[in-house]
């Protein structure tokens, strides 16, 4: 039981770090097109939905971010951030 709580805490910490990266480096970056910032906000909302298990929240966010990851209007630095976030989300089980 204690191990389970520690694992959940680590997963929640990882999710919070991912939310922080999305918020600071995508949502608040005015050089990023509005549709991409909106998708990042939707991914953040999906990650913050405590009614679902962490793996389901991560899968929801992955689906949203993968859809916009190939947008030709996305700045290269933002695309790199999105790919890094996707990699981190894929590790959440």
UniProtKB/Swiss-Prot annotation:
Disulphide-bridged cysteine pairs: none
Family per record: Belongs to the UPF0147 family.
UniProt-recorded name of the protein: UPF0147 protein PF0239
Organism: Pyrococcus furiosus (strain ATCC 43587 / DSM 3638 / JCM 8422 / Vc1)
Taxonomic path: Archaea, Methanobacteriati, Methanobacteriota, Thermococci, Thermococcales
